[in-house]
Regions:
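Sec-dependent bacterial lipoprotein signal peptides
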Residues: 1-18
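Short, cysteine/histidine-rich loop/knuckle motifs that typically chelate Zn2+
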Residues: 18, 54, 96
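Bacterial signal peptide processing site
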Residues: 19-23
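Electrostatic cytochrome c docking/interface patches
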Residues: 24-47, 62-70
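Short sequence/structural segments immediately N-terminal
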Residues: 43-49, 117-122
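The canonical Cys-X-X-Cys-His
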Residues: 48-58, 111, 115
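Gly/Gly-Pro-rich "capping" loops immediately C-terminal to redox-active cysteine motifs
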Residues: 57-85
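Axial heme c-ligation environment in periplasmic c-type cytochrome domains
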Residues: 63, 86-122
């Protein structure tokens, strides 16, 4: 039969890796704009800065960026309860409870809502 060369396998694997969700997580805003976005509620803004900002406001982290509708839409289609469950259990590079052990389910819903909305909806 056919012998597949290791170099060909490696090239195929690299091509597929370029199609991963994190590779399509291109920011719609500049880094400065992403870093400036905060929830209007001061308490929630503090939680966001402490638990979410590092990954969700920095391109290349693999996390859906704040305001990146294309990245958030498939996640939102799972429903809020499923998203909150994923946050609480951890997913991929996100640790359980998303570095917010004191967050309530309502806090997670508010944070998801903030991060998944376009900037003009804030």
């Amino acid at each position: 039969m056919f012998e597949v060369r290791p170099a060909l396998l490696l090239a195929g694997a690299l091509a597929l890796a370029g199609c991963s969700p994190s590779a399509t997580n291109a920011p719609a805003r500049s880094a400065a704009e992403l870093e400036a976005l905060r929830p209007a509620d001061a308490r929630l803004a503090g939680v966001y800065e402490r638990a979410c900002f590092l990954c969700h406001a920095r391109a290349g982290s693999g996390a859906p960026l704040v305001g990146d509708i294309a990245a958030w839409t498939p996640r939102l289609s799972k429903g809020t309860d499923a998203l909150v469950a994923q946050v609480k259990q951890g997913l991929g590079g996100m640790p359980p409870r998303g570095l917010c052990p004191d967050c309530s389910d309502a806090d997670f819903v508010d944070l998801i809502t903030f991060m998944s909305q376009p900037g003009d909806k804030r």
